[in-house]
Curated annotation (Swiss-Prot):
Name recorded for this polypeptide: tRNA pseudouridine synthase A
Molecular-function GO term, any one: tRNA pseudouridine(38-40) synthase activity
Class in the EC hierarchy, top level: isomerase
Taxonomic lineage from the root: Bacteria, Bacillati, Bacillota, Bacilli, Lactobacillales
Keyword flag Manganese: no
């Protein structure tokens, strides 16, 4: 009897070439499928389907995948089995048996990303893989003033990297906020939206940092929506500071 599993993953993206499987590359999908197929011991290969891709160096606190497993096993048994086989930079943090029409990508209602920025003149060696570093002066009040402009439904063409396969660049951001983590001397950005374009969060963060540094006017996002020109927002924040925090679904879609 085949069972469909919804699995939530946390991973350190430093040594992964992104989420999606690629030839001769160590990816999150590769190590997860390796563990699942080892547990299955069947000739038919089991494929994992993710809620979306993360790039090389990008981390996840709550990436979601689904797959169909050919043997009866409890959710707890699956969680323990996978974690006994996965490398130390990838962990299953939650596991559920879900209906066969649940799809990790196509039934999602939104995603939440974090971006952490470390401060200081020099790069902290213990943060270099887990934050983006910004050494220049910042007025966080200017950034806070700009954050409402990030929210809403807009054409984010100025904030998408080349290589995007999206047919439309219109997205809705329900919530955008920034706050200081004074204990770690970091600035944290948080974005919750119905979906995000290729490198969108990293480009938006780089643009907001330029606003905080006085290189751009506070409400420059409004102009960038109008011009729809990536060359007007050239900078991209490093992958190391980006975290996929959570993927949202309707609880009804997960009920058996």
């Amino acid at each position: 009897m085949t069972q469909r599993f919804k699995v939530t993953l946390a991973y350190d993206g430093t040594n992964f070439a992104g989420f999606q499987a690629q030839p001769n590359q160590r990816t999150v999908q590769f190590v997860l499928e390796k563990a699942i197929n080892k547990m299955s011991k069947k000739d038919e290969y089991i494929t994992v389907y993710g809620s979306g891709r993360t790039d090389s160096g990008v981390h996840a606190l709550g990436q979601v995948v689904h797959f169909d497993f050919p043997h009866p096993i409890s959710a707890k048994g699956m969680l323990r089995g996978l974690n006994s086989m996965l490398p130390l930079d990838c962990e299953v943090v939650d596991c559920k048996i879900v209906p066969n029409d649940f799809h990790s990508r196509y039934t999602t209602h939104g995603k939440r990303y974090l971006y952490r920025v470390s401060r200081g003149e020099f790069v902290n060696p213990f943060k270099r893989l887990y934050t983006g570093h910004y050494k220049y002066p910042l007025d966080i009040e200017k950034i806070k003033e700009a954050m409402p402009d990030v929210e809403g439904t807009h054409d984010y063409s100025s904030f998408v990297a080349s290589g995007s396969q999206a047919k439309s660049h219109v997205r809705t951001i329900y919530e955008a906020k920034v706050y200081e983590d004074k204990v770690n001397d970091e600035i944290v950005f948080e974005f919750y939206g119905n979906g995000f374009l290729y490198n969108q969060v990293r480009i938006m963060v780089a643009t907001l940092l330029e606003i905080g540094n006085g290189k751009r006017p506070v409400h420059d996002f409004l102009r960038l929506y109008e011009v729809k020109d990536r060359s007007q927002a050239r900078q991209t924040a490093p992958a190391s500071g980006l975290y996929l925090k959570e993927v949202y679904y309707d609880e009804e879609d997960e009920k058996l």
